[in-house]
Amino acid sequence: MKSYLLVPKESIETQARVGPRGTEQGERVLSRTTALRFAVANKAPDALFALGLRSATLPGARPPVSGQEERRRKGKGAKSARTGTRGADSSTPPMPGATVAEQTGAEPGSYRYMPLIGATMAHFYEDHTEKEARGELERDFEFIPDVVPLSFPGPVSAGQPGPRNRGMSSLAEREWPDECGVPLAHAQGIRGAGVMLGILDTGVDADHPEHAARVIQFRYVSLFPNSPHNPARDIRGFDPDGHGTHVCGIAAGVHHGVAPEVDLYVASVIESETIRTSLGRVAAGMEWLLHQFSRPENSTRPAVVNLSLGFPLMPPPGISEADYNLNLRALQTMIRRLLDSNVLPVVAAGNSGPDTVGYPAAFPESLAVGAVDFERNVATFSASGTVGRRVVPDIMGYGVNVYSSTERRCNNQAFYERMSGTSMAAPYVAGIAALYRCRAPDLTALEVRDLILSNAVKLPRSGTHKTGKGLAVFR
């Protein structure tokens, strides 16, 4: 199987821009103006549907089609039936217990149209179908191979887990120093109410005591699009790894979270076994988040998204520089679409130390977060550096030995752990952003970003580490 993210070429232009390594060069980049046309770029899903690929598009996201295109589709479905291949409009369910190979032998592929981020994810099971699709679409669309793995910058250290002490007072009062403003905000009734917080991670243990009292909107994004006969369901959140549960606890845990009254929207996009994900899964996760945020009841509410994940610093073995750069630009467009939708993207800078910068933290659209301990010392692992004229990180957050929830054990015992990493610092800053958006919901995402940067507590220089504007605080 081959997977591609299809992006309209009309949204790509050549201009001088800082390159992926920080060098000035002429390269193809996704422009802000034409990126806004993505939502109506329906030629790709129309053509893929006509070729017999199965649709796995979110409900309500398919674009309208003309009568001519509808007749073309029906003709394609009839042809598929005559040749023994199940077309995309077939009502025949898959055989119970059928293997992936058996199922893919009955259809040429599948696709997921994502209008809110302006792209289509296509999976081709047969080379000749890919060739047909390229013949139909390659003049107008860039086929970006979904081959570069993303992963979260794993915690660099963790304390021994321990069961929750049920006699313990609110951890928010103990964990967050007065200087960061969180205790004062909570005392003033500013706790994140009315703000939507999106998390792209390994998931969340929705029955952990930190999260069980709230309704969490949750979506597991599978490697392959869901069958229309077995669509994705809204289920109780789960997390086999614990990383996402820890991140959610820092930002929004009811006992020790920075913003305990936000509404959580969690997309599980990272495999617990490999701690990796792909551009396509992250794209689907972002599309789902924007779909939730744009519902009529949510359309005027402020939102923040936390991304404790990133691309490797260099193309992995076997991945060309060109494919790597295309993946970067597609990811940058997704981050930009968050900002265009008035959603603030908060991104972990990475755990590779000074003079190293990863993506998406290096994108100017991201609010990149480095890590300090509770004494304001910069963590040795915190990534920092310069990409062209951009200095990363933008801001610092508490990211050393941060106490938060992890997944429950098989005996239903709830555990907490101390973990370190910029993965922990980012949700702290996301929580601070949620507090600002709670207090002033009419501020735009860019205005909230500026507020966080202007209110930061300056930090002393620490060797070659860069600390941006300083420690994020609420005041």
Curated annotation (Swiss-Prot):
GO biological process: proteolysis
Classification via InterPro entries: Peptidase_S8/S53_dom, Peptidase_S8/S53_dom_sf, Peptidase_S8/S53_subtilisin, Peptidase_S8_His-AS, Peptidase_S8_Ser-AS, Peptidase_S8_subtilisin-rel
Subcellular location: Cytoplasm; Periplasm; Secreted
Protein's UniProt name: Subtilisin-like protease PopC
Species of provenance: Myxococcus xanthus (strain DK1622)
Domain Peptidase S8 as annotated: residue spans: 165-475
Gene Ontology annotations for the cellular component aspect, listed alphabetically: cytoplasm; extracellular region; periplasmic space
SUPFAM superfamilies for the chain: Subtilisin-like
Pfam families cross-referenced by the UniProt entry: Peptidase_S8
Regulation affecting activity: In non-starving cells, secretion and protease activity are inhibited by formation of a cytoplasmic complex with PopD. In response to starvation, PopD is degraded in a RelA- and FtsH(D)-dependent manner, thereby releasing pre-formed PopC for secretion. Secreted and active during starvation, and rapidly degraded upon secretion. Secretion is significantly and reversibly reduced by carbonyl cyanide m-chlorophenyl hydrazine (CCCP), which dissipates or reduces the proton motive force (PMF), and by nigericin, which affects the pH gradient.
